[in-house]
């Protein structure tokens, strides 16, 4: 029985022909290559234990891993059921020494790192075997006579000298080769590992069978030093690995190393008990980072000094023993009850999970999980034990089809969406992909298997590999448009230089260990980084000379981020690596309280007020009480999808999903001011949104063959239609856009989409960019005219901040501005020739304290500790938490009033305990139980009343003026929570305005006789130009025609587009934040001018006109004075939002704050996120928000880890839905509006799962996705995970790091590293 897939048996099949062509038929027995016991990696519980085997497993912990073309990772792992005594003691494995072969005349046995014995028939010279269950190949060099099989296909990368050596055995797993040879002690040991590119890691052995040295693919040498740790006994010579020395950075190690010599670079050291058990691991600094305790050589405890501590109790202290209890210090205690085909695990919270199994020995598999709530998930396997189907608790099944070697060829989702791939029969390399929409991508490869051409719907991307030292690193990439990028690599296989399609060069320098120490951009601006010996980033010096420093505790958790001025954010950690406290430079502090399950149960904000969280049996958030007492409750279905949310007013919103778990509908409850409604969502097979329909509007999306959004049609309930149409180039960059009936806009771009021109009507805009592709000049001209309508110039500071700008109009207007920044990157002054110069001041938390304009009194601002605006000049002592809680009770009952207990006569309060500011700037505010502003009373008695629908969208308002007149307005929204119309009734006259949308950007205002179209700069919210046209209402016939074409996903034909009035073009001219301050016309004359204001953006207007855009993404509603800001409304007089952040605490601890109270530096175009434009104090404050989000999301996800193992295992097994997008130039443009559905449940359109944003973010925040820049040691990586949590958020929100990376994307376990895209 050969165990070979039928497609490789050839002449042994009848007639030498595979008549069925079936790739899943096997000849021989599935026992070939079968292990004596199943792998212990899945399932895992707790810290962790395998409930199927009862074994304690410590997954590999990396002690060091220095960058190399193929990085050598020195990792140790432990499995209690492994009886083998390694060089760290019984049950431990290390690279190189933990795998070996046993060859005899009758059999071949591969002993893996877990001590499992994988059995094969005898391996004669030249013979090969395949294990279907382990998915690996064995082949021996030489020939036993007869016709030898050629070393081609999967074996082509094996050097010729090994092909002919009978004393060489190759193990092929994925695309990695392990070369074994017989050592003097008679054991076949690992001599080298290598891949298709030829990078070799070599292992050197002593005559006693000790691994004494390793040479990695970068040429470094490592020396392993041993000691006599215990007395020799049967099967144990007592020798243990004392440590590993970095012996040489480039070259072989010295012939002799004295371990006692000073100055040796010990990468890791180990300490043992007198019984030979490992009791401590020391890092490169000599610090103890891991400790272990033993009884009769069985692990009974492990931990980290000052951190994790876990203890275990066993039924028997022997390798066949099983864990009966696991105790986490400060955490859960779990007990294990073993049955014949199941294990029940109960924890100290009284929850019981049941793991069910089938089969025996190496064929035993995990078949079902019954969770604490009774929900059941099931898993199916093929003959070789490979996962082929999953059924979730709702019975929804995902299936896979595999070929004879277990390679996945097709995946079918529960909704019957199919993804297919074709691989090369010999090498297993990807040849073709087909997605659920039947789009195909094909791959051409060179002799090494590198992808040289990828052809897809958008065209071809070509790759060249011209560096013989690094044959798998691309040196040239040509995109489908012909743009070419060049890449240079250093000896570690790290990117050294990148030349873009414009010839601009970015350079990267590394130290001897592959850590990025300096990077320079095409302007020569340099960024430097410093590291400690553990590879942790401790200093970052940016191009303008500003610097950030980082500190860590002994466990590698980040404890401090500070700027050059010493302004710091501090982090304190509790048990289980859970964040306990964060404090910023201004003294603001957030405290986190977790329960024994590691769930965040209380959060105390800077005002000493507490938010609380409750969870169900599965660790899902079921109740959340905010700082203001707003209580929200959540319900889920058996598949963990959110199905209902009950708000503080008792109203319930419900959610339904399709079979693929995508949001299908939302039922929004009725309120006093709006009826109940249902909003429905339809998806294409590949997961793109096809339509979103509600009571007032249906939005339909049409895509081109590549997947780019081609047409968005918004069909109102009364038949009115607005459509936006785009065309794209091969890179997915917009080339033309047509907004409704306005003239089309042609975009002229270069490279990956940098704008250098735009054509609209008879006007052309031209853009000049610097070497970093930042705009430095813009002008506009009419056809046939040499003179520019305007010229706009910009100069940038080293970090990209706007430093100077100048606008010159043909009509003579000349506007010049200069911007000043301090060492923290905060804007401290603006010099302006058209407006009074201004100076700004900030507190230590980065909040705007004052603005001083020439010739005017200073405007000053005060805040409580939580960032709520205060009135008055007096300072009050902080109230204690008890007083804050009592005050919060006002909101818990839904009661709100203007006075608070913190007020004193004649002054405002010292803080707003619930973050609901009730008085500011002479106005009084009242909120409902949900935190929505329902009334504003002005100093003159003017009264504004606001009313909301069940999705917390403003639908009605009345404004009673002091003179007794009244105004009334009503608003309508689509299913994406975009405002599509408003009707204003003033003095008995009703006016309706409709709005058209381009994704998240409002692009049109349609009045009864006028259409105004706003065109934004590509990819952002900064307005570029405006088109104004006279129009007439569509006749019924045209409306029907529009509806018919929209229903078919087609734009209205050009011959049917009504002739509107001549388009009048106006150009926006903005400040450093993208706020319009000037508007010029097509004659080069100034048409509108606004006066900048700290919180209002513009107030007043020097040349009044209809220009309602304020801060990016904001639209001034004249009828209310509010600014519509996509998902919320902004109160300009208060500098805050009128309702809470739909993202909840994910948007930060203060749900009303705008741009972190720094409107001179930051902006919020959607009312959800804050894309900060500077670093400095904001880095620290963004970190606080990141830590807050981490706490909530981690708390919600801890209970899902076990089921997630199967999903992760499933995903890691060549998931087509991941593969197809990771390594191909596919422009996966999401509809702008589909990132969130507004105040109902933001994020659910993209995840369709829970109230948190994404499981991937959870894994990142929990450290599972942590990486160091140079693949540094896992020990350092694990420590850096805490810093990574913080840094990722800071990098996203504060742009604190300017370096770029080329990212490698593995094709899962195919181990294919895709060229940078």
Curated annotation (Swiss-Prot):
Location of region: Disordered: 395-419
Pfam families per UniProt: DUF6531, RHS, RHS_repeat
A GO molecular-function annotation: toxin sequestering activity
Single GO biological process annotation from the record: protein secretion by the type VI secretion system
Chain intervals with Basic and acidic residues compositional bias: 403-415
Record key words, sorted: Virulence
Keyword ATP-binding: no
Transmembrane regions: none
InterPro entries documented for this protein: DUF6531, RHS, Rhs_assc_core, RHS_repeat, T6SS_VgrG/RHS, YD
KO phenotype (gene knockout): Deletion mutant together with deletion of its cognate immunity protein Tsi5 leads to a significant loss of fitness advantage when placed in competition with parental strains.
Known role: Toxin secreted by the H1 type VI (H1-T6SS) secretion system that acts on bacterial target cells. The producing bacterium is protected by a cognate immunity protein.
Name of this chain's protein: Toxin protein Tse5
Upper taxonomic lineage: Bacteria, Pseudomonadati, Pseudomonadota, Gammaproteobacteria, Pseudomonadales
Name of the encoding gene: tse5
């Amino acid at each position: 029985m050969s165990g070979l897939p039928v497609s490789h048996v050839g002449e042994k099949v009848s007639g030498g022909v595979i008549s069925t062509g079936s790739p899943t038929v096997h000849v021989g027995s599935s026992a070939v290559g079968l292990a004596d016991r199943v792998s212990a990696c899945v399932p895992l519980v707790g810290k962790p234990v395998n409930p199927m085997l009862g074994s304690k497993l410590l997954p590999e912990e990396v002690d060091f891993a220095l960058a190399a073309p193929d990085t050598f990772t020195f990792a140790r792992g432990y499995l209690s059921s492994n009886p083998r005594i390694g060089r760290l003691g019984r049950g431990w494995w290390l690279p190189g020494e933990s795998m070996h072969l046993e060859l005899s005349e009758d059999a071949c046995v591969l002993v893996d790192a877990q001590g499992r014995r994988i059995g094969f028939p005898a391996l004669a010279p030249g013979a090969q075997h395949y294990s279907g269950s382990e998915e690996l190949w064995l082949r021996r060099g030489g020939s036993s006579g007869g016709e030898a099989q050629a070393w081609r296909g999967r074996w082509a990368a094996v050097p010729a000298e090994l092909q002919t050596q009978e004393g060489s055995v190759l193990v092929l797993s994925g695309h990695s080769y392990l070369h074994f040879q017989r050592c003097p002690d008679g054991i076949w040991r690992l001599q080298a590992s290598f891949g298709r590119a030829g990078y070799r890691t070599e292992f050197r052995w002593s005559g006693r069978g000790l691994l004494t040295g390793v040479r990695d693919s970068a040429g470094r040498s490592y020396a392993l030093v041993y000691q006599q740790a215990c007395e020799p006994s049967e099967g144990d010579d007592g020798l243990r690995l004392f440590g590993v020395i970095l012996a040489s950075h480039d070259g072989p190690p010295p012939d002799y190393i004295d371990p006692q010599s000073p100055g040796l670079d010990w990468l890791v050291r180990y300490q043992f008990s007198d019984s030979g058990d490992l009791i401590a691991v020391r890092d490169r600094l000599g610090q103890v980072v891991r400790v272990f305790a033993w009884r009769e050589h069985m692990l009974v405890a492990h931990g980290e000094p000052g951190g994790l501590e876990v203890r275990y109790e066993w039924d028997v202290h022997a390798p066949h023993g099983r864990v009966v209890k696991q105790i986490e210090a400060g955490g859960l205690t779990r007990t294990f009850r073993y049955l014949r085909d199941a294990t029940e695990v109960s924890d100290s919270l009284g929850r019981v999970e049941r793991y069910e199994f089938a089969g025996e020995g190496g064929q035993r598999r995990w078949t079902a999980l019954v969770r604490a709530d009774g929900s059941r998930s099931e898993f199916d396997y093929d003959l070789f034990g490979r996962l082929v189907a999953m059924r979730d608790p709702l019975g929804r099944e995902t299936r896979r089809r595999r070929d004879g070697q277990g390679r996945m060829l097709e995946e079918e989702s529960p909704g019957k969406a199919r993804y297919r791939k074709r691989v090369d029969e010999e090498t297993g390399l990807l040849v073709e992909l087909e997605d659920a929409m039947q789009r195909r991508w094909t791959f051409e490869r060179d002799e090494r298997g590198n992808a040289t051409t990828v052809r897809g719907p958008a065209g071809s991307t070509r790759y060249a590999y011209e560096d013989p030292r690094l044959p798998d690193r691309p040196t040239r990439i040509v995109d489908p448009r012909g743009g070419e990028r060049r890449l240079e690599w250093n000896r570690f296989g790290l990117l050294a230089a990148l030349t873009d399609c414009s010839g601009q060069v970015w350079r990267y320098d590394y130290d001897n260990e592959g850590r990025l120490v300096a990077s320079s951009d095409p302007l020569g601006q340099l960024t430097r980084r410093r590291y400690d010996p553990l590879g942790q980033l401790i200093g970052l010096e940016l191009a303008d000379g500003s610097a950030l420093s980082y500190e860590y505790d002994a466990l590698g958790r980040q404890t401090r981020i500070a700027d050059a001025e010493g302004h710091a954010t501090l982090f304190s950690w509790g048990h289980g690596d859970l964040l306990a406290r964060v404090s910023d430079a201004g003294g603001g502090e957030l405290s986190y309280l977790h329960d024994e399950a590691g769930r965040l149960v209380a959060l105390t904000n800077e005002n000493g007020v507490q938010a609380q969280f409750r969870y169900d049996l599965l660790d899902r958030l079921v109740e959340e009480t905010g700082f203001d007492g707003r209580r929200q409750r959540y319900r889920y279905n058996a598949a963990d999808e959110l199905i209902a949310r009950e708000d503080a007013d008792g109203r319930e919103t419900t959610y339904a999903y399709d079979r693929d778990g995508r949001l299908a509908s939302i039922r929004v409850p009725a309120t006093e001011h709006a009826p109940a409604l249902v909003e429905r969502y339809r998806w294409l097979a590949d997961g793109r949104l096809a339509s979103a329909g509600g009571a007032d509007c249906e939005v339909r999306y049409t895509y081109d063959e590549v997947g780019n959004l081609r047409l968005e049609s918004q069909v109102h309930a009364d038949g009115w239609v607005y459509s936006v149409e785009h065309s794209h180039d091969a890179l997915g960059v917009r080339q033309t856009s047509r907004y409704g009936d306005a003239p089309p806009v042609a975009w002229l771009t270069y490279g990956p989409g940098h704008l250098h021109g735009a054509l609209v009507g008879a006007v052309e805009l031209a853009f000049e960019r610097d070497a970093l592709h930042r705009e430095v000049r813009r002008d506009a001209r009419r056809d046939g005219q040499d003179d520019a309508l305007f010229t706009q110039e910009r100069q940038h500071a080293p970090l990209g901040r706007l430093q100077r700008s100048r606008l010159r109009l043909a009509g003579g207007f000349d506007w010049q501005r200069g911007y000043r920044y301090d060492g923290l990157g905060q804007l401290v002054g603006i010099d302006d020739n058209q407006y009074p110069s201004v100076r700004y001041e900030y507190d230590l938390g980065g909040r705007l304290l004052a603005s001083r304009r020439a010739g005017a009194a200073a405007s000053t601002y005060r805040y409580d500790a939580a960032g709520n605006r205060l009135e008055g000049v007096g300072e009050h002592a902080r109230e204690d938490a008890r007083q804050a809680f009592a005050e919060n009770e006002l909101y818990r009952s839904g009661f709100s009033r203007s006075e608070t207990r913190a007020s004193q006569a004649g002054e405002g309060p010292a803080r707003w305990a619930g973050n609901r500011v009730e008085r500011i700037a002479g106005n009084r505010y009242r909120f409902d139980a949900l935190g929505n502003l329902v009334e504003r009373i002005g100093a003159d008695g003017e009264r504004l009343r606001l009313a909301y629908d069940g999705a917390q969208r403003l639908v009605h308002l009345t404004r009673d003026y002091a003179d007794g007149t009244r105004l009334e307005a009503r608003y309508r929204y689509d299913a994406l929570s975009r405002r599509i119309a408003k009707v204003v009734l003033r003095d008995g006259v009703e006016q309706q305005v409709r709005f058209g949308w381009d994704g998240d950007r409002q692009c049109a205002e349609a009045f009864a006789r006028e259409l105004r179209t706003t065109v934004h700069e590509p990819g952002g919210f900064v307005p570029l130009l405006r088109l104004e046209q006279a129009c007439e209402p569509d006749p019924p016939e045209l409306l029907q025609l529009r509806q018919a074409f929209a229903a078919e996903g087609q734009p209205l034909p050009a011959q049917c587009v009504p002739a509107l009035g001549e388009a009048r073009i106006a150009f926006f001219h903005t400040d450093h934040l993208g706020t319009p301050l000037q508007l010029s016309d097509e004659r080069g004359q100034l048409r509108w001018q606004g006066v900048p204001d700290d919180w209002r953006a513009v107030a007043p207007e020097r040349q009044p006109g209809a220009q309602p855009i304020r801060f990016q993404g904001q639209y001034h509603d004249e009828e209310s004075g509010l600014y519509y800001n996509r998902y919320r409304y902004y109160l300009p007089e208060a500098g805050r939002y009128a309702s809470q952040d739909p993202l909840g605490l994910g948007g930060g601890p203060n749900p009303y704050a705008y741009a972190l109270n720094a409107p001179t530096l930051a902006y919020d175009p959607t009312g959800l996120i804050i894309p900060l434009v500077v670093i400095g104090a904001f880095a620290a404050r963004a970190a606080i928000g990141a830590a807050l989000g981490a706490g909530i999301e981690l708390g919600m996800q801890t209970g899902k880890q076990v089921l997630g193992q199967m999903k992760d295992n499933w995903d890691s097994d060549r998931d087509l839905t991941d593969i197809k997008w990771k390594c191909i130039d596919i422009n996966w443009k999401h509809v702008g509006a589909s990132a969130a559905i507004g105040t109902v449940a933001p994020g659910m359109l993209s995840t369709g799962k829970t109230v948190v944003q994404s499981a991937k973010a959870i894994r990142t925040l929990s450290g599972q996705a942590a990486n160091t820049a140079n693949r540094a040691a896992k020990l350092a990586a694990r420590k850096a995970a805490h810093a990574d949590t913080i840094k990722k958020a800071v990098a996203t929100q504060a742009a604190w790091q300017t370096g770029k990376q080329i990212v490698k994307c593995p094709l899962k376990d195919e181990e294919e590293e895709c060229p940078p895209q």
